[in-house]
Each structure stands twice: as C-alpha cells, then as structure tokens.
Amino acid sequence: MARCTVERRMRALGLTGAGAGRTVRTTGPAKGNPVPDDLLRRDFTAARPNRRWVVDFTYVPTWSGFCYTAFVMDLFSRRIVGWATSSRMDTDFVLGALEQAIWTRKDRGGGDLEGLVHHSDHGSQYLSIAYTGRLVDEGIEASAGAVGSSYDNAAAEALNKSYKRELVWRDGPWKDRDDLETATAQWVNWYNRTRPHLTNDDDLPPTTVEHRYNHNHTTTPPTTV
C-alpha cells in the first residue's frame, strides 16, 4: 500500500505514527578548555574490565519538562557501571554518573582504575576543569573524538539509542525526574543482568561476561602441605 494511502486512512481514523519527538541539542562545545587526543580511534573493544570507558548523555521528555540521563559504560562487557539523571545538563550531573562508576568499580569492586581510558565527545561538561580533574585524581586518562563526529563515540551513542528505544519511547513520558530515575534504574538492572548483547561472546549479558572473566582469572593460592 502506498505511503500516501496509509497516511490518508490514518488521518481519517484520527491516528498518528509513533515518532521520536523533538530533538534537543545536548553537546555544547567546550571553549578554552584543553581537548584530549582520541585514544580509541573507533576501536570500541577492551581486553579486560576497567581498561576503556565511554560516556555520553541524552535528553528525555517528561511531563515536567526535559530531563537528562548520563551513562558510563565499560567496553569490555558493555556493562553500565555508572549513570545519573538530572533536570540540568551541567557538570555536576555528569560527575554524578562518573562518581557512581568509580564507586562501582574501585570502591566496591576493588578494581584498579590506573591507566583506564575515559572516552567522551567534546561536550563542555566532560572537558570542564572539575570533571577532568576528577579523572586525574583517579589516574584515568581522558580521550575525546572529533568535533561533531558521532562515529568517534559510536558505542556510547548506541547505548543512548537502546535506552531510548527500549525504555523512553516505549514506556514514557514520565511525570517527573523521580519517576524517570526509578524507570531508568530498573532498565539498567535489566540491561546489565538479562539483556543479550550481540557484541559479547554467545550474546551474553554484561554481568555474565564479567563473572566468567573473573572466574577464569582468579588466582588460586598454592596448596601448602
């Protein structure tokens, strides 16, 4: 059936197609702040956990106005190790996601973040003095793709699209940020623990990949006689 025929019949029935809604610009270029080199060069793989993180945030419409969700993802397993929601897209917002990632991987998980590569776009939040200073504190090396190139941060962009497709456009809009935060927490738990990932061996969920890695790389102490 021709598209024009479909549109005419939908109008007659008072129906409209599902759309992604109005686009909101979330990346503001950093002015005056040093810009790190691109250390990934579109290689979104990692040999083990805590070697490469990618970050980004996206907008989410609610009945109270636009809110924003930031993610930190480990490229080894595609696990979301940190996230945050906010009604403002400022540095404190993305720092919240970073702090959760540091707590998850280092403080709670006992991992070593020294030499980890943190990859972002040129958003002013990620290149701010407060944010980059926090990376330095943890021995994390900053990396950023070219200005305006979504391909240079494709893994993080893909995560945002999954979040929008699997949660935001399916179940939203929500009343306010509190409702969005609750829904996002549930989605992240499902994403990490249950959802199959085509980039992982056997399409395994992120936590399963990491459990398998940790099991295979646990050093067994020698038996004493």
Where are each of the predicted segments found?
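Basic, flexible linker segments flanking DNA-binding modules
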Residues: 1-48, 149, 205-218
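An active-site-proximal beta-strand-loop segment
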Residues: 42, 46-84
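C-terminal domain-tail junction helix/linker
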Residues: 129, 133-140, 161-225
